[in-house]
Amino acid sequence: MSQPTLLDTPLYALLHKDDIRGFNRERPQNGPIDMVGGDFRGLDLRELNAAGIDFSDAYFRSADLRGIDFRQASLEGASLAHAQISGAYFPPELSADEILMSMNFGTRLRYRTR
């Protein structure tokens, strides 16, 4: 199993400094943002503009994800163990059961095909 990674990018550094407004201001407006395998454990990410971000294989243990709209983000393989997700939107490819399994047991999110 892969381990969470501290990514070496300016945008990732903003998130780790809890500067969500700075991240939203500095992020590219189009094109994907690579946060694959990133370590987001325990971070408060509320108000994050997650559109276009690839969070594949990321770790969100105990992170505050309340109110984030992940519908335009990739979360395949991410772990949500003990994360706060009230009011968050998830991609339609993720079932509620899949999200609950990840929250309760730390399993990796698996996308279902339509």
Q: Which residues does each predicted region cover?
A:
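Terminal non-domain segments
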Residues: 1-5
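Tandem repeat scaffolds
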Residues: 7-114
